[in-house]
């Protein structure tokens, strides 16, 4: 559209909209935010609003229009953000009453999923991260920032595994929005997983990712000469991502970012790695059933009483520690709180008085805090001295450090207490924000506005008496303010100093100089007091904002105290033990329980288990037994015990010795990946391949029914080969549940492989699951009995028994032939030796040189025929 042909107002709209083509523009017009043209049609559709129209100017006709009341905008914006849109807020920059000509307007903020600060738009117990990704041929840089709390962190991933590491971090952090430079935004390997996870992807100009520009942006923001103090001086990609994230926030929020006061550089290798499959399979924070919290590890462990503590505890569970000193420090703190129940109860009661200090500080810093936010901040600060007193005699080193980090912030608390009303209104333009006695001019203007009605009543009474007009009344309208109303019969009594302003059918309206002077005082006072209160409030907010760094320091201490107290509360309630975590490669649990299942089962119904796995004689535990017998539960509870211990928590067991684990891998269950066209088996093999490529000797691998997604012998072969590879090439602690009883033969072949099973008691045709892990493999799977328990029709169960009997008879014959062949092989020493130490056989050499994963099924079959022919020739 041509702005030259538009009305002045609409020309202004078009000019501003042109600068924000990817946003819905909310254009302030009086008491409404209006949208026009395509934006209006979109908003009307998405928010179910009535679509109207407005004249846009000569030759332009009426354009679609849809509006929302400005005081209710937050709720509407939230709905649009949830649907993946960005909203640009265009406000009036001057009072329309005082404007000469067209009111000045401009965008004061762009609301995107990753730049939210409003409490109603944010998840209370989770961070709202914006992420930025920088890239080069050598790797990736990742920065995340939570504008609502001021948290800012960056990491760099280099080498062949950099993309995998990047996506693992993205999966852990779950940012609401990711910004990419145009080149990276065209890479499906990056954008595909992001969009599949429901993360909003925004393209940001490449110049912001330029290292020199990013470096300058960061040093200017932090007021430093270089970045060596943040540990990223030599991390170009991390620096580029961090600078771009900061530039994006400045461009979107257009406000101070003083609360983003530091940059925490970290290395993914400093923490236990939990890939997306492991987090999903172990249900750390999201239930497999419905994606909710109930039934997750977080659901059990989160007994926090502050939103800050809840967010921190969640991050601890998602990123367990590898530093033994930090782990032991948390255990010591939790231990003291466990053994001092009175201290724990007092501390939790006091923490409950603390509001979300992190986000309150964030809103103060960006200038969006209202008077009620400052009151909540004051109430939180009032609790800090009592928290410090409660911790006066603690002995645990970490508790002492946290106590000493608590800044009482007396000056901030006293300022708010002295200035802000105890129950102020939400809106900052309605008055009533400041306390009486805080500012003399405010007090005087309030007195005038408050007493104005009494003054009017006095004038009315006096004029009735002076004129003798008993029906005389003083009224008010917006056209000419206060007036004296005189009915027609009383007009002869009107004195000469009355000035006629309006004649109506039954009365005439007059004004007097005295009345106009009074009107000026009363109306000006009401308007002036609201303006003055707002100005003073902004000054107070700025004074508080200057102390945001101190508030954040106390907020972090409160959050950690809350998280530690939560761990202690859970440990005390449910009988957890303090684990011994050291540098060994032992994982020994006595009386171990599943933290989630024991909470959803009846009291005392869960069966504890012992487990020992290490990198020596108990390297691989092969666990067999029926479905529903408890194989998966035993393995998962072992993995969860490791995660809890290294997160700093006690664990659900009688005792626990846990050698440090660098990664926990789980391959549990699978389904087709329809989005990428991958079958269940392909998904399973991809996850297993990731484990085999990434696991180290210090990893814990949990495999459940690997190989069941293909033909029996294919699956058995793959499971066997995987077990051998883990045992010989990796040597890590491994728990492998399987239905392939043939794998039990590995105990006699590979040292360190041990057979275990979940005990079952047979009672006639029924079975009772004892859910106890015992030494030795299972000889049966009890599949038919499980089917019967599941409610299969009796005829199906009986037919299954008949088929099973036939198959077992045939398998018995095949087994006899295999055993006879094995006996013949055992009588041929040379052949037996070649099984373990192959000679230089050309067929074997060719086999060893094959890239099996690169062969198609047809190529594999042809190769097999050729090798068989060569083998026959060499006999």
Swiss-Prot record:
CDD domains for the chain: ABC_MutS1 (cd03284)
Gene Ontology CC terms: cytosol
Gene Ontology terms describing biological process: mismatch repair
Entries under PROSITE patterns matching the protein: DNA_MISMATCH_REPAIR_2
Residues involved in ATP binding: 625-632
Gene3D superfamilies membership: 1.10.1420.10, DNA repair protein MutS, domain I, MutS, connector domain, P-loop containing nucleotide triphosphate hydrolases
GO molecular function, one term: damaged DNA binding
InterPro entries the UniProt entry points to: DNA_mismatch_repair_MutS (IPR005748), DNA_mismatch_repair_MutS-lik_N (IPR007695), DNA_mismatch_repair_MutS/MSH (IPR017261), DNA_mismatch_repair_MutS_C (IPR000432), DNA_mismatch_repair_MutS_clamp (IPR007861), DNA_mismatch_repair_MutS_core (IPR007696), DNA_mismatch_repair_MutS_N (IPR016151), DNA_mismatch_repair_MutS_sf (IPR036187)
Swiss-Prot/TrEMBL keywords: ATP-binding, DNA damage, DNA repair, DNA-binding, Nucleotide-binding
Main function: This protein is involved in the repair of mismatches in DNA. It is possible that it carries out the mismatch recognition step. This protein has a weak ATPase activity.
Similarity comment: family membership: Belongs to the DNA mismatch repair MutS family.
Name the record gives this protein: DNA mismatch repair protein MutS
Organism this protein belongs to: Symbiobacterium thermophilum (strain DSM 24528 / JCM 14929 / IAM 14863 / T)
